Amino acid sequence: MPVSISETDIENYAKDGALLIKNLFTPDEVSDLREGIDANISHPSSRAKVASNESDPGWFFEDFCNWQENSAFQRIIFESDISEVAAKLMCSEQVRLFHDHMLVKKTGTKQRTPWHQDQPYYNIEGMQNISFWIPVDPVPLEWTLEFIAGSHQENWYLPRTFLKKEAKWFPEGSLSDTPNIDENPEKYRVLSWELEPGDAVAFHMLTLHAGAGSGALRRVFSVRLIGDDIRHAPRDWETSPEFPGLSDQLPAGVPMDHELFPVIWPASRA
C-alpha cells in the first residue's frame, strides 16, 4: 500500500524543510537497493570520491549519477512511491530526477559531514526541490543526520570542500559563511530522527544539515528530485556533481528538459 502523505506532512515540509517518512520502502525494495549499493561500492564510477582522511579508522565514500548503469537504483527511482511523495511534498505537477548520490560510512568512521546546504553545490535555481536520504542499515540518533528547521527559507551559504574547507564553487566572500551551529546550538531548532531500513528523510536542498561519523556500517542512497519551478543555472566552475557539456545544450534559465533529468511523475508505468 502506498505511503500516506497528509496535509500536515506537506505543511511541515514547507515550514521545516525536513520530514521523516516511515516505511516509504518495502522490505523487498530495501533488499534490492542494498544489493545495488554494494554493487556500486565494488564497481565505483569515475565520479566516486573518498571524503575521509587517510588517518581515519573508517571510510567515508560517495559516488554520483549511477542510475543509468545500476538497475537497483533505477527501480527505486522509477518504480517506488518516491516520485508521488515528492510531487505532494513539493506541491509540483511534475517531478524530474536531478541525480542520485550514494554515501557510505564504514564502521569507525570519524569524519563528520559538516553543516552545509546542497543547492549551492549544484547548477540549478528554484525552490521546488527535494532530496530523499534512504539508509539500508539502521541509523541510531547518534549517527543520523541533523537539520536546522526552517533554514531553507534563509540565506544561501558558501559551499566548501568537506576536508580542506576550500571555496571551490562560489568565490570566497560572495556568499555568507555557514553559521557556527555547534558552538551556538541554543539558537537553532535541530531536527533528527532514528531510522530503520525502509524509512527515509525528505529535505529541501537549501536546508542546513550535518552528520556525525558512524560506529557501524551506514549505507545510504540519496535521490535528488526537482519540480516545476527549477531552472538551469550554469556555473563558471565545476559543480558537484558535474554535468560536462550540459551548458552547451541547455541554456541558462530554462527548465531541466534533458535526457539526464527524466520525468518520473506523472509516472508511465505499464
Located regions from the model:
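Non-heme Fe(II)/2-oxoglutarate
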Residues: 36, 41-43, 47-55, 160, ...
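Non-heme Fe(II)-dependent double-stranded beta-helix
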Residues: 1-16, 21-115, 121-122, 236-238
